[in-house]
A protein has these predicted regions:
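Conserved acidic carboxylate
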Residues: 21
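Two-component/phosphorelay signaling modules centered on CheY-like receiver
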Residues: 24-49
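Acidic, metal-coordinating helix/loop segments flanking the phosphotransfer/catalytic sites
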Residues: 45-63
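His-Asp phosphorelay/catalytic-motif detector in bacterial-type signaling
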Residues: 60-62, 87-92
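Conserved phosphotransfer microenvironments
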Residues: 65-82
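As written
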Residues: 75, 107-115
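C-terminal output helix
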Residues: 103, 120-131
Length: 141
């Protein structure tokens, strides 16, 4: 019993990936990619920006996979919002969108988003990049 307690205490803390996506099919696809390649990462789902804000107020988040077109707002604007808050500015964000636009790329870059990826091109390599991302995102002026 004591050995089990010691092992539990010494275990590496679990990372949490917040997936902000309103499409159930895309949620399941991302969850399958995460479960297959990243067993040590807990996946939390949010269907709206309001749900994402509530999650982040309560739980530590290691990375965010963010759709751009959500029922209650724009993912790129949410990335800017997070970049303006010191407690969230260092969280790596990947925008995963059906229709990435030049405007979205510009806004994402200004917020320090590490990748903007078309949903059809999204895969584990982008998650690896986010989990290994060490550089603090730039602050907006």
């Amino acid at each position: 019993m004591q050995a089990q307690i010691a092992t539990t205490r010494a275990a590496k803390p679990t990372k949490t990936c917040l997936v902000v996506e309103d499409n159930i099919f895309d949620q399941e696809r991302i969850k399958r990619i995460m479960d297959k390649s990243f067993q040590g990462v807990f996946v939390a789902m949010a269907s709206t920006l309001e749900d994402a804000r509530a999650h982040m107020a309560r739980y530590q988040t290691s990375m965010i996979l963010l759709d751009n077109n959500l029922p209650d707002g724009n993912g790129a604007n949410f990335a800017v919002e997070l970049a303006e808050k010191p407690e969230f500015a260092g969280i790596p964000i990947i925008i995963v969108s059906d229709w990435p636009t030049p405007f979205m790329f510009d806004k994402a870059q200004s917020a320090g988003v590490i990748h903007v990826v078309n949903k059809s091109d999204f895969g584990a390599r982008y998650i690896h990049a986010a989990l290994n991302h060490k550089v603090k995102r730039p602050r907006l002026n």
